[in-house]
Amino acid sequence: MAAAGGGGGGAAAAGRAYSFKVVLLGEGCVGKTSLVLRYCENKFNDKHITTLQASFLTKKLNIGGKRVNLAIWDTAGQERFHALGPIYYRDSNGAILVYDITDEDSFQKVKNWVKELRKMLGNEICLCIVGNKIDLEKERHVSIQEAESYAESVGAKHYHTSAKQNKGIEELFLDLCKRMIETAQVDERAKGNGSSQPGTARRGVQIIDDEPQAQTSGGGCCSSG
């Protein structure tokens, strides 16, 4: 059973793991679902997959001896579902904001998501801005320099991916996990020093007993709503 991280001590103690929630946001057709399926199941479907509301996949990792359980939420990109965004990104430790490199408008919409996330969750959430479909480089409409400069200006990191060719995806999630671990460790040290502020644990690391988790988690895709 999950329990919120308490005082000092490493979260990666024997039999325990970091538990992080990551949400994918972006317009429809940018490839969010394809990225998640490629990462979690190494699957790719050329046909467009429309996500209705949200779904999630789970992934277990071992990074530098630290166990990590990821819950990756894939949200719908259609405008009519935008108002549901806060339901899915609240309490998130990380956000992956995806745009299609052949679609300038999808990049502009990412900027709106960044503003919303910073307003609602502050600077604690780790942001990744992802230019997907680099297999269509000849059709690129979003400048690499512009995208990378923007990401840096908002405290995010920029990545280049192709779900079709399976490029850049492992690097994206590995780097994000490392950043979330670093953030969680800073929070743990702050709590250990008695300097935590009200609400600090809102996106704090969750400590999970690994054995009970293994018994109760199916590890598959669970649709929401």
From Swiss-Prot:
An individual GO BP term: regulation of axon extension
Region described as Disordered: spans on this chain: 188-225
Domain of life of the organism encoding this protein: Eukaryota
In-chain residues carrying the UniProt-annotated modification N-acetylalanine: A2
Cofactor: Mg(2+)
Main location, first listed in the record: endoplasmic reticulum
Residue ranges of the propeptide: 223-225
Regulation: Regulated by guanine nucleotide exchange factors (GEFs) including ANKRD27 and RABGEF1, which promote the exchange of bound GDP for free GTP. Regulated by GTPase activating proteins (GAPs) which increase the GTP hydrolysis activity. Inhibited by GDP dissociation inhibitors (GDIs).
Organ and tissue specificity: Widely expressed. In jejunal tissue, predominantly expressed in the apical region of the epithelial cell layer of the villi, weak expression, if any, in the crypt epithelium. Capillary endothelium and some cell types in the lamina propria also show expression.
Recorded GO CC terms: axon cytoplasm; cleavage furrow; cytoplasmic side of early endosome membrane; cytoplasmic side of plasma membrane; cytosol; early endosome; early endosome membrane; endomembrane system
InterPro entries: P-loop_NTPase (IPR027417), Rab21 (IPR041833), Small_GTP-bd (IPR005225), Small_GTPase (IPR001806)
SUPFAM superfamilies: P-loop containing nucleoside triphosphate hydrolases
Localization per Swiss-Prot or TrEMBL: Endoplasmic reticulum membrane; Golgi apparatus, trans-Golgi network; Golgi apparatus membrane; Early endosome membrane
Effect the entry attributes to changing T33N: Defects in GTP-binding. Abolishes the interaction with VAMP8 in response to starvation. Abolishes the interaction with TMED10
UniProt-listed CDD domains: Rab21
Alphabetized UniProt keyword annotations: Acetylation, Cell projection, Cytoplasmic vesicle, Endoplasmic reticulum, Endosome, Golgi apparatus, GTP-binding, Hydrolase, Lipoprotein, Membrane, Methylation, Nucleotide-binding, Prenylation, Protein transport, Transport
Membrane association type: Lipid-anchor
Modified residues (Cysteine methyl ester): C222
Ligand binding (Mg(2+)): T33, T51, D74
The keyword Membrane is annotated on this UniProt entry: yes
Family statement: Belongs to the small GTPase superfamily. Rab family.
NCBIfam families: small_GTP
Function: The small GTPases Rab are key regulators of intracellular membrane trafficking, from the formation of transport vesicles to their fusion with membranes. Rabs cycle between an inactive GDP-bound form and an active GTP-bound form that is able to recruit to membranes different sets of downstream effectors directly responsible for vesicle formation, movement, tethering and fusion. RAB21 is involved in membrane trafficking control. During the mitosis of adherent cells, controls the endosomal trafficking of integrins which is required for the successful completion of cytokinesis.
Domain description: Switch 1, switch 2 and the interswitch regions are characteristic of Rab GTPases and mediate the interactions with Rab downstream effectors. The switch regions undergo conformational changes upon nucleotide binding which drive interaction with specific sets of effector proteins, with most effectors only binding to GTP-bound Rab.
Name of the protein this chain belongs to: Ras-related protein Rab-21
